[in-house]
Amino acid sequence: MSAHPGKPGRYYLISYPRTASNLLLKILALDSQPNFSSGEVDGGYFFMPADDILIEPRIRARSIGDWTADERAQVKESFQACFEAQQQWLEATESQGRSVFVKEHTVFFADPTARSDLQFGPSPTREPAWTVEYAGGSTHSKLNITVLPDEFLLTWLPTFLIRHPALAFPSLYRTVIKREGKESAAADNFASLLTTVEWSRSLYDFYVQNRESLPCSPDQSLEWPMILDADDIIAHPATVALYCNKIGMDPRKLCFHWDQFKSEELSQIEPNQLAMRMSLYQSTGIDTSKSSRGINVDDEASKWRSEFGIAVGDHIEKLVRGAMADYEYLRARRLRADRG
């Protein structure tokens, strides 16, 4: 059941990289869902152009306090342009009476000051959070780690997609290596590997604190925000069906089997996208071996050192262990079919 039956809704799928978000979108079969539209690029990612600037070695290797005036202006202008493009798309889509389902990685629309703090540690002279210009307001509360003002975030009903860090983090590093090579991936204290569950938890708590302001009926407000775990997407289709019902999608449209991409189709795909989605493109259905069932961080850390080298393995292990408390916090609150 949708938040407001008969009225278009805004549904935000908020994730971090390698959480099986592309698999979820494949299963949801958004093109077949009546009265729903997804973001124009891979189901969303409106803020990817800003992230493309921020991951350039010349930017990511330095804290925000060391950026030049031109670099700061470039990043700010990019975030504003991304936001305005999203606004235009929303207006055009909603004018057709369609609900929107958009995904975004937290790292894509994270406030650059929060991003710098995560990578380099809090600055003793921390500057105010960066916020895009929005006619609806400019409030930026502490738990809001994005460049979006509170008022805009609260026009959405959010779902947080999570995955065990011991699977997500090394998987991300593998894609960085494919994109940049081993030397660049490990440069500048692994500046290329910017990932965290902390931001998902912070935004989740932000939405919990503001439930009464969410665009849904009072009797539904306690259902939001929602959390999906990749393990349930992989192993528990009933949870995905339940989720569909809650957001007004048709569970009968769910797709659990598909055709493998042909070689000529793969040759037309941009290399970076191919690196991120090759396993999905080569599949014909859900691979249940991708779940975290039985995973042990000690055992995995040994594998990372063998695969990437001691320094990289140690770094990934540190990130994973540091993320586990936030992951377990969110996982305990996830949507499950056995408890509705």
Curated annotation (Swiss-Prot):
Phylogenetic lineage: Eukaryota, Fungi, Dikarya, Ascomycota, Pezizomycotina
Tree of life domain: Eukaryota
SUPFAM superfamilies on file: P-loop containing nucleoside triphosphate hydrolases
GO MF, any single term: transferase activity
Gene name of the record: ppzF
Protein name: Sulfotransferase ppzF
Function comment: Sulfotransferase; part of the gene cluster that mediates the biosynthesis of pyrrolopyrazines, secondary metabolites showing insecticidal activity. The role of ppzF within the pathway has still to be determined. The single multifunctional NRPS ppzA is sufficient to produce peramine via condensation of 1-pyrroline-5-carboxylate and arginine, N-methylation of the alpha-amino group of arginine and reduction of the thioester and the cyclization to form an iminium ion resulting in release from the peptide synthetase.
InterPro entries in the cross-refs: P-loop_NTPase (IPR027417), Pyrrolopyrazine_biosynth_F (IPR053226)
Keywords: Transferase
The protein's Enzyme Commission number: 2.8.2.-
Pathway in which the depicted protein is active: Secondary metabolite biosynthesis
